[in-house]
Amino acid sequence: MPATPAPASTPTALIYFGKPAVRFRLDARALGFDADGNARWLVLTKFFDAQGNATRIMANSDIDWRSRDGYVQWQTRLRYGQPAAILKTQRNGPLTMNVRANVPRLGTVTVHTDTRTWHGPRIVAQVLGPHAVAIGWFPRESTMARIVRIDGRGRRRTLVVIAGPSSSYRDETVLPGQHYRYVLDRADHRPVALSPVTTFPPPPATRVANAGGKAMWLFFTTNPIDTIYYNNLDPQAIVAQAVRAGLHYVELRTAYGAYWEVTPEAKPTIDAIIDGLAAHGIGTIGWTVPRDTTVEDLRQSLRTAYYRTAKGTPLTGLAIDVERGDEFMGGAPQGPSALWQYVRDLRAALGPRYLLVATVEDAYLEHLTQRQYPYEQIARYSDVLQPMAYWRMMRRKPTTPVQVDVLLRASYAKLVREARRSMPISIGGQTDNEGRNGYPPASEITASLATSKAVGAIGECFFDWDATQPAQWDALAGYRW
């Protein structure tokens, strides 16, 4: 039996599990039809070495995914094991995707499908938490759609009659823990009765104070080549460090887009961290990174809000990272409005009482106003705003404690103006060395904490755990909050 190949770096900085690739092919499959009224098509790359054996790229590939037939979103390689993309479309008919491998440079492969040949339900109802149900139909209706809801007592209610083009509807008048059935009636179609659905029970109790005090962002991967691979995490050491630093909570990433990161293999380690922190009175706020306003993406944030460890420990709130850019919400078809629409939809699904922290781009450091970023709308549906005030990353030259004080005061003040309301703010501070200016020294960590507290912030959460240096941990431990 041949030995298992070890991950190896190539001269082009590609990291393989196996030998370098010389060609690739595409595996494509229909993912079916969703509650947003879309057809979804998965296209996955498969790489092969010179001997024709399968090889796996672990990092640093560059793939272009192109189609004129819908919206294409690339997927983290961790979700499907290799570079992949999902096309969503409301087009009923032939679909084409061109995939070009830039790194490694292996040319372009084209793949085709036709939604008219797909099997599976084309009308879907899916629960979105305790307060919303999404109903989608494919293909798009052009004339009229009527949706009737039947509750657990058999009472019928016409929810909406949509005139003109339509493909989905969200019922935000449902109650927690209830059974519902829906009937969709469309022009020139027979009425379709959908399978019963049951809404979620109320989410765990939370409060705004859970997002106060000192905190740290913590994330991990399931890729064994990464330093933050979950198997490299030491739950006891993490808990001990959090206790020593006097942290009030940890923001732990659970989902990236529609990819749920707490895999069955990682769950025991992640649960041990959450349980260990809770034993010392330290909360864990779930952190998700939305990439689209789809039901599939929203359900990962909802899954986070309802997450419990094997011992039953709940999370203490939800923080959503609403950013522009291709790795975040920048590619969403709605453009910048997707940022606030996601927050609105999540609030509607969860209800008004669950702690929702919106991690937002810094208005002052990034020179943003309401015209470029929807601060006011995001604030309307959030309990806490958390600006990413990464003072060294955003500057051309290294800063001093005095400059940190000036920058954070300006950051706080501008966010209040852009939000156009008085509400809790937790500063997002910096411990990592991202950017040209290196790690903030301990004196700047202390200055940022002092300024955050002085201006009225409820706390400061630092990015990020893995990059935080011993002197920075000492500074955190030395400041009481």
Say what each PLM segment does.
Residues 3-54, 102-120:
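Short S/T/G/P-enriched beta-strand
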Residues 216-219, 283-294, 340-372, 421-434:
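Aromatic-lined carbohydrate-recognition surfaces of secreted/lumenal glycan-active proteins
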Residues 248-258, 304-336, 461:
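Active-site groove signature of glycoside hydrolases
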Residues 344, 352-356, 384-435:
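Glycoside hydrolase catalytic-domain groove-lining segments
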Residues 117-142, 176, 189-205:
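Pro/Thr/Ser/Gly-rich low-complexity, intrinsically disordered linker/stalk tracts
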Residues 203-242, 253-255, 290, 432:
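Boundary/entry segment of secreted carbohydrate-active catalytic domains
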Residues 389-393, 424-481:
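Substrate-binding cleft of secreted/luminal carbohydrate-active enzymes
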Residues 315-316, 322-326, 371-405, 463-468:
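Aromatic- and acid-rich polysaccharide-binding/catalytic face
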